[in-house]
Amino acid sequence: IDYGCGAGRVLIIAAELGFVDITGIELSPSLVETCKSNIGAYAPTNPASKLTVIKRNAMEYVPPTNATVFFFFVPFGANIYRKVMVRIRESIEELPRVVYIVDIGSKLRSFDFEVEGCELMGTVEKLSLFKLRPSR
């Protein structure tokens, strides 16, 4: 799931890397339309991947229980991140599983709030990878 997916570049890259069920969340109507156009043009070249864009406020989006990778490219501030993390936590408590958070810009590390069960796995330049485990 790519939060703040914009034009959909990350969705297409994820498909190229072998991800199958790929979702972008975007609030801007014009970016949603651009993203739909881009993934529509790409889809015939990779029919194995299911690419979807959803026009929704990230704070209101409830991730499906099959989601395992969450991607953030500096889309928003601490208050929104906090609420999105609550939604992700709810999803992994509903169906316990380990998930990964890819954070470009290392914003998540710079906020002064803790996410229970969230472990920094590594950082390369401005990319941070976290592992998030269910609490039970």
Report each predicted region and the residues it spans.
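Conserved S-adenosyl-L-methionine
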Residues: 16-21
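Short beta-strand "acidic-cap" motif of Rossmann-like dinucleotide-binding folds
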Residues: 24
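Conserved SAM/SAH-binding beta-strand->alpha-helix loop
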Residues: 28
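S-adenosyl-L-methionine
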Residues: 33-65
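A short SAM/SAH-binding and catalytic strip from SAM-dependent methyltransferases
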Residues: 67-80
